[in-house]
Amino acid sequence: MQIILRGLVRRVVVAALLAMSAHAFAGPIGYSVRSDVDRKLYRIDMATGVATDIGVTGFSKIEGLAISTTGEIYGVNPSTAQLVKCSAITGACAAVGTLTGLPQLQVNAGLTFASNGSLYLAMNAVVYRIDPATAATAALGGSGPALSGLAGVAPTATCPSGLFGMGGNGDRGKFYCINTNTGAATLLGSLGPSPLDVGLDGDPATGAVWGISNDEPGQVFAVDPVSLSVSNVNTVTLAGKAIGGFESLAIARTGTAAVGDPVIEPAAAAIPDIPTLGQWPLMLLALLLPLAALAVTRAPVTNSLRRHR
């Protein structure tokens, strides 16, 4: 009985912890660099805007961020035209290689992995395809407007590529579909949020496009790429204080995090048959703990009586 109770208690404790962990992040996890302020990588709960400082990137400026299907974070340093890979544990970034063929003067940049698995960069009104292993760059063509952010989700009727972009500066607030063969941007409409610069990325699990504005303070928001409706507008906060200066965004698929990020333990997925919805894990835990304690305290007494018989 004692062993059974201990096993049950252990499983319920794990279930309760998973339930609380799932509640802690109601939306997808985003990553962004506060490049206009401290050059640190931050983890952001996109449902609430609550940010956590991960660490210094080690680069003067990171304009675009993207996350691969394997959870690796990539970024672009415009001043040196480098593709970098960033750690979700320390925030430190390391150069992958030089992006060839880019103009000397780089401005706002958008970076994302599309649903076809390719990595795309928008910079200086040109769209590029990038090899994430070598940083080899191929220009697809002019986008027309200068894009500040790119997001890759599933294709839609109005955007067969599933690659979306958002304008900045003179094209602020405008939402586009990007042709992955020519780089051309087709205007889909205008959004309510219209920052001069924006970080953008998509959640492949839900099809939603997420953004973060380079305002003071910054705001996170979600875009339905079909209806163009905007929701979940929240101010970015750090320890309860509103902050800004973000110019990039990488969104991890809902329920996951970047490689090495301790907020979601990979081992948790290996624990079988433990429901995590609702409040029952905590209630069951409250019931089983007293029973386990009773079994533990009574066991020595029972053994002692047996020895004296």
Predicted regions and their residues:
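A cross-kingdom C-terminal cell-surface attachment/processing module
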Residues: 279-301
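Conserved beta-propeller blade signature
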Residues: 29-34, 72-75, 118-122, 128, ...
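An edge-strand/N-cap motif at the start of beta-rich repeat modules
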Residues: 26-49, 163-165
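Cytoplasmic C-terminal tails of single-pass
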Residues: 301-309
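A short beta-strand motif characteristic of beta-propeller blades
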Residues: 50-57, 92-102, 136-142, 184-191, ...
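Repeated scaffold domains used in trafficking and secretory/extracellular systems
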Residues: 60-68, 103-113, 144-155, 194-202, ...
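Short loop/turn segments that connect beta-strands within beta-propeller blades
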Residues: 45-48, 86-91, 130-135, 179-182, ...
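N-terminal signal peptide c-region/cleavage motif recognized by signal peptidases
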Residues: 21-22
